[in-house]
Structure formats: structure tokens, C-alpha cells
Amino acid sequence: MAASTGYVRLWAAARCWVLRRPLLAVTGGRVPSASGSWLRRGCRACDMSAPWGGRVLPGGVQWRGLWDSGNRGGSDETSEGGAEDGATASTGEGPVVTALAPMTVPDVFPHLPLIAITRNPVFPRFIKIVEVKNKKLVELLRRKVRLAQPYVGVFLKRDDNNESDVVESLDEIYHTGTFAQIHEMQDLGDKLRMIVTGHRRIHISRQLEVEPEGLEPEAEKQKSRRKLKRGKKEVEDELGPKPQLEMVTEAATDTSKEVLMVEVENVAHEDFQVTEEVKALTAEIVKTIRDIIALNPLYRESVLQMMQAGQRVVDNPIYLSDMGAALTGAESHELQDVLEETNILKRLYKALSLLKKEFELSKLQQRLGREVEEKIKQTHRKYLLQEQLKIIKKELGLEKDDKDAIEEKFRERLRELVVPKHVMDVVDEELSKLALLDNHSSEFNVTRNYLDWLTSIPWGRQSDENLDLARAQAVLEEDHYGMEDVKKRVLEFIAVSQLRGSTQGKILCFHGPPGVGKTSIARSIARALGREYFRFSVGGMTDVAEIKGHRRTYVGAMPGKIIQCLKKTKTENPLVLIDEVDKIGRGYQGDPSSALLELLDPEQNANFLDHYLDVPVDLSKVLFICTANVIDTIPEPLRDRMEMINVSGYVAQEKLAIAERYLVPQARTLCGLDESKAQLSAAVLTLLIKQYCRESGVRNLQKQVEKVLRKAAYKIVSGEAQTVQVTPENLQDFVGKPVFTVERMYEVTPPGVVMGLAWTAMGGSTLFVETSLRRPQPSGSKEDKDGSLEVTGQLGDVMKESARIAYTYARAFLMEQDPENDFLVTSHIHLHVPEGATPKDGPSAGCTIVTALLSLALGQPVLQNLAMTGEVSLTGKVLPVGGIKEKTIAAKRAGVTCIILPAENRKDYSDLAPFITEGLEVHFVEHYRDIFPIAFPRREHREALAVER
């Protein structure tokens, strides 16, 4: 608003300048002192240079105006064309700023360029800065200024998000706007920046189309004809020069064209009388404005200048209503509503309503600011009082310094512990350093955290162990069924500790298929031994710092998992479970499996060195238990440090016992059921195991049991039944269609097909080997006598080598048994192992492949319900294989009655439980010659009969 007052002064000074311009001829071109001082005050108010000085403002902006024509002493033509001359002259670089001389605003000016603005309309007597970027509109405004027609129509757009300077249709703007005069125009090349002042309200009548610029010379000719008509009243005429109208025509019917010119008409106010109601409204508006000024200092300067500009605003209700609306931050449509209102009384009411809203908003802002300030004061006061209280207590000896309190806390932790001397030396050194550090330094926090970890380790503190064999055995039997090897090893550990009179650490590794209870048995062992339990998984771990910690200098450094374990368990002899040790990763941060070597080495972990603590820690009393699915992926040095215990899968009888003893009661408790509401018989569980859960573990069986009981709970809650009886007949209603409907692929094996036994991480399974002719056998031709063997079924390299060895031995064995049979020598044979999507590898199918090739060559099927496993050498020797328990379980599950195993696996078979080997005929062989009569008993019988004859 200060700029507004400046422009008013400048306008008055310019009028005086125009009136006294003829005196320049008398004074010799000197500016009269009165006019000069007036102009200087006006220019200073607008931050402009005096027009006669010709000075260039900072930034290369030069002010030029219509007043230059007066100094040139031109006639009427010169006066009207001065703006054009001033706009085209250039005496400096940078954007050209044209300050237009104030002139008498015409009462009627129907044809105006249209400028569309957003958010806030321009009210009469108010100034606004407008930027125009549209190329056509920029050219039009330049032309109007050159023709001494610095008038525009400013209209508000209906859409506040539309940032365009022009509109394509009159429907996009409100039709009531403001007739404005351009006071100053800064030409920036691609855009214009103007200061416009509103004068009166106007209404759009229609759209006009702008004629090309070539028609301007006609207007110039008309202007020159008026050159001789100048008389004594030339000074008065110059106060209000008659604007030169640019030729326009009515706009075409094409509505997509940009609206640049419009025809307007003035909006007249309704007649009104200054009644008591009007006086009351004006007084209330003035009072509200003053209240807003008192609350919000931002309005103070601008509003006071507007209200004290040499006139009483109260006496002008029209101006007061516009000023009240313009001061508010109301919505654009509300301000436009005030602009369009022609009834002065209603306009005053609307302006007062907007001012009241602004006043309430200002009060709310002031209240919020006061509350925030009050909170800040209270916090600051509380802080000062606390600091004073600390100083007073310290002076009276009632409270120690923060550093003294921290040191006492750390020493209190170590008072009842047996701390090694080298550790105590480090603690004393760090405490001495802590006392010299500033409380707010970063090194202070690092040292304090280090001491916190160092004093949180249970130096010399051990938990009381349970050395009662009977109690430990009862705990293990209570939690897990089977797993005799694991239980025996734990009881042996307790027995040794009892005889020694002290406990020791040990490193065990349980390996076996998923879901057999490797992780859960570790918790039971901790409970049986009376040790604290801590578990962390190393599956996918790639950072050595997870095990050995970070260096203390790093931001956010922490010790490794083992030190965290000691702090959490508060004992030196916990049971630590390192899960999924076979799935440990390796990354650019190091190899965690190598970091475990020090941790799991009984000779080294008595002085385990964590990177963060950097002092030796005794881990020799920790019982480490690792779990793995396969041991092949465990590095050999790490495997050598652990005692491997195989946790094999379960047979159907074991699964049934586990389900009845553990899984079903646990699932009933989770589902909120008891035995009377949901009953699962042994027949249902057996069918569930046989047709849905054939894997080695019981995790899937647990899921299926929970699924059955959840559906039973739903039926009871929904009111379908009071009790649910699950039977083999309705089992499919609970768990869906059976997953396994066939025990094995071939009920009767044809010639060329033999059942083998395989072992995977999921347990054992049966594996058929199929052989067939690839092309017809040649007859009579001596060419192409050498046969071939093609293998498929996604076999690994080891299994492919085993197939080639078996093929070579089968040809030799057949020529030995039947020299006249050259089937394997001349035939092209295809060998396939079904389930081709499953990768297969290993040498244990050698005997099975030899038998399948001989069966195809002899055209005789093998003994039904026969399965075999074993690696065969090139000379026919049968070598031992692994996974005997899993393979035996798989064979019994498939209904096999006769099994052929390598002789060296007799010890593994003898360790099996009687219920696994029950009903099986087992043959242990050392050479393939021992397998042939077992697999082909009929042939041996026929040969024996032939010998007898």
C-alpha cells in the first residue's frame, strides 16, 4: 500500500507537470521548483528516478514516459505520440520499463483488451501487478500503449487452476470485471509486467476480433489532421487526450479462438441514500478493520495508509465496501460476488461478512500463537528450574555429577561378578577417559555405550544345571516322540558332566529333512538341562559383523549375536541354537561361515574376540547346537568342528503317534475346542498321513490337522452342528481332494522297468527307471552293429556317469550270461527316469539301471514288489550308499516286500526300529551277480530245470 500512495503522488505530480509544461518555454526549459519538488516526492514514493533526470535505474532498467514529449516542446501531435516515441527509443540495455503519464480516464471506453486473472479480482481504486505471457496479447498491449490507449479490462477466471493469460471462451470468465489503467509497463521480451489501477466496474457485452496491425497508419493519418486544431485550451486538452480507437470488428462465430478484445459497458450502481443503516454498516466495517489491524500487524501499514490518505473513508460507502473485501483472504467467488453487487447496502453487508470471517481467523491465529508461546515459556522455565535444582543439590552434596553417577552405575554392575584382570584394566581405562570428556561430545556417547556393553556381560556367572538323568529324560520324552539318537547324546552329556563335577561346552549339529523337530528339540534340551535358551538364524547371512560385531569407531556399531546372547541370557553357559547353518551366505562383507570357525572351535572359543568389545570372552561353557537340512553345503572345516547327528524322517506309525500325542491336542487348544466337540479317530489320521502328508516331517501334517479343526470350529459357531465327528468318509469335506491317490507308478512292473530308492532333503521316495528301444533292432545287416544309450529325466552329471557305467557293465554281464544275446550291443536304447521336472543326481541308482537294461534285453520283468539301491562299479562291485532309513521307509510306504541293499550298509539297516523292518525281505549283496538271481528268479529256475534234464 506504500507503493499505492507513491503512485497517487506520482499521478498528482505528473498532472502538475503537464499543466506547467508551457512554462518551460518561458523559463528556458528549467523545471519550476514547486513542480520539481512535487515530482521528486512522487518518484521517491514509487522508487523511481525523476523523469527529467534521464537516469537509468539499477539492473539496466530505464524509465521513460509520455512526459518526455513536453520537454521536446511538441504540439498536440507530439503530446499524443509521445508514448510511442518513448517506447521505441532505447538508450540502455535490459528490459524497457515504460511509466505512462496519468491522464483523464474517459467515462466511456467500450473496446478493451481482456486480461484474465485468477484468485483475487481487481477492485476500483486498487492497484495490482499483472504479468502477461501470451504472445498475441503482449503484441496487442504494446500496440495500445503506442496509441496512447493504456486501458484494459481485468476479469476473474471461474477456474482458479487455469493459469493462462487469455481464455478461449467468454464462459471461462465472470462477465463483470474492472476497467483498469496501465500505470507502468515493463517489457521483458517474452512477457509484460504491468501495474494497473482499477477505476470502475464494467460488464462484457460481446467478444471482438482484433484487426491486423497494418491498419494503424490510417489512425495515424487521422491524428495528423488534428494537428492544426490546437488553440488556447491545449493545456486543458492535454489533461484528457482523446484516445485513438483501434479498428475492431465483431468476433467470428468460432468460439475456439482466443478472446483478446471485448466490448464492455459500464456498470452503474443503484441509487442509495446515506441512511442510519448505511452509517451503522460503515462504522462496523471500520471497527472490524481496526480490530484486524490490532490483531495482525501485517495489515497495519497498508490499511492505515488507505484510511488516512487525505479523505474520510467512512463518508464513501462504495470505496469502503471494496476496501473491506480486498483486505480479506476470502475465496475468489466470494470476492467476485462483492464486485458484481450493484446494491450498495447489500455490498456493505457482504463486505462486512467477509471481514468478520477474517477477524475470526485472525483471533484463531493469535490464540494458537499465544498457546505455542506459552508452552515454550513453560518448557524453558522448567528447564531453568531443573538446572538450578541440579546445581543446588550438587552444592549441598545431595546429588553427584552425571559422570560420577555413570561411573558408580558401571562399577555396581561389576561388583558381584568375577571379572578377569585384563577386562578390569580396560574398564578402568575407559572410565578415566569418560571423566575427561564433555557430556555433549560424540566421543562421550561412544565410550558410555562401550562401557554399557562391557559391564553387561555376565563375567563368571553361570546358571545351575540339571544333572538328574531321570528328570532330563522325562522332559525330552514329554516334548518329542522318537529321536532316540538325539536324546541319547543329551543324556550322555549330562552323565559326563555329573562324573566330572562341572559342565563343559559342546558343538552339536542336527541334520535332517524339514519338519522333523530339529529346532524344537533344541528348546527341549535347554529345558532338560536347565540352561537359558537363545536362538539366531544364519540362513542368508552375508555380513561377518552379525557374528563378530562392528568396529567401535563406526556409527551405530554393535557387538555380534554371541555377545548379545550373553547380555540377554545373563549367564556364561546358555544353550545357543544356530539355525539353518547350511544356508549361510557369502557377500562382499566377508564369509560368515569362516567367522563361525573361531566361534565353534572348542580350542579357540575360550578366548573369543568380538570386534566391538576387543577383549577376550570365554565361550567354552556354551552349548552350541546347529541345524541343517543337508550337510553337503556346509564347508568342510566347519563340519569338522561339529558333532553330526542325523535326525531322520518319520514313518507312518511315528507320524500317527506324534499326531495323537502332540499335534491334535495343541491344535484343539489353538482352535478353542475340546475332545467332546471335535473328534479325530486314528483311522482319520492314518488316511490323512497316507493321502495328504507323505513328507518326512510332520509340519504339513500339523497344518492339515489345524485346517480340519478350524472348519469344525466354524461349523460349531455357525450353528450347523453341536459336535463334529470327522470320519474317513467326510474327510474330503475338510481338507479337499487327496494329494496322493496312487502308492506307486507301476503296480506291476513290465520288462525294462525297475523300482529304485532315492533320498532327498525331504526324505526318501521310490524312483522308477524305464528303458525302451529307440529304434527297431537291425536284423541281418552287419552295418550299424554298435548300439547307443540316451538318458533323459533331468539327470545330474554323477547320475549320467553312473548310467554309462551301468550300460557298459550290463553289456559285459549279458554276454557272459547269454553269449548269443547281442541286444545291448546292437540296440539303440532310451533310458528315462520319470518326473522329469525334478532334478536327480547321485550314484545310488547304478544297480537299478543295470537291472532295467537286463530286463529289457531278456524281455523278462523283474520280481514284483522289488526295490533296490546301490552304486555299481565298472566290474560289478556294489558300493554302499546313504539314506538307508529314509529309503527303507519309502519302500515300505510303497508296499515293497523285498529290498536289495549293499552289504556294507548292513550296520545302517540294523539300527532301524523293528516296526520299520517288519514285513520286509532284505538281501545284502557285494556283487551284481548276487542281485541277478534275486531279480530274475524264474530264469534261474528255468536254467536249473534245463541242467537237471
Swiss-Prot record:
It catalyses: Hydrolysis of proteins in presence of ATP. Residues 1-65 form a transit peptide. Keywords: ATP-binding, DNA-binding, Hydrolase, Mitochondrion, Nucleotide-binding, Protease, Serine protease, Transit peptide. PROSITE patterns: LON_N (PS51787), LON_PROTEOLYTIC (PS51786), LON_SER (PS01046). Residues 68-94, 213-240 are annotated as: Disordered. The active site is at S844, K887. ATP binds at G512, P513, P514, G515, V516, G517, K518, T519. It is an enzyme of class 3 (hydrolase). GO terms for molecular function: ADP binding; ATP binding; ATP hydrolysis activity; ATP-dependent peptidase activity; DNA polymerase binding; G-quadruplex DNA binding; identical protein binding; insulin receptor substrate binding. Its EC number is 3.4.21.53. Residues 223-232 have a biased composition (Basic residues). GO terms for cellular component: cytosol; mitochondrial nucleoid; mitochondrion; nucleoplasm. It comes from the Eukaryota. Residues 112-359 form the Lon N-terminal domain. Detected in liver > heart > kidney > testis. Its main location: mitochondrion. It is found in: Mitochondrion matrix. Residues 748-938 form the Lon proteolytic domain. One of its GO terms (biological process) is negative regulation of insulin receptor signaling pathway. InterPro entries: AAA+_ATPase, ATPase_AAA_core, Lon_bac/euk-typ, Lon_lid, Lon_proteolytic, Lon_Prtase, Lon_prtase_N, Lon_prtase_N_sf. Homohexamer. Organized in a ring with a central cavity. The ATP-binding and proteolytic domains (AP-domain) form a hexameric chamber, while the N-terminal domain is arranged as a trimer of dimers. DNA and RNA binding is stimulated by substrate and inhibited by ATP binding. Interacts with TWNK and mitochondrial DNA polymerase subunit POLG. HAMAP family: lonm_euk. ATP-dependent serine protease that mediates the selective degradation of misfolded, unassembled or oxidatively damaged polypeptides as well as certain short-lived regulatory proteins in the mitochondrial matrix. Endogenous substrates include mitochondrial steroidogenic acute regulatory (StAR) protein, DELE1, helicase Twinkle (TWNK) and the large ribosomal subunit protein MRPL32/bL32m. MRPL32/bL32m is protected from degradation by LONP1 when it is bound to a nucleic acid (RNA), but TWNK is not. May also have a chaperone function in the assembly of inner membrane protein complexes. Belongs to the peptidase S16 family. This is Lon protease homolog, mitochondrial. The lineage of its organism: Eukaryota, Metazoa, Chordata, Craniata, Vertebrata.
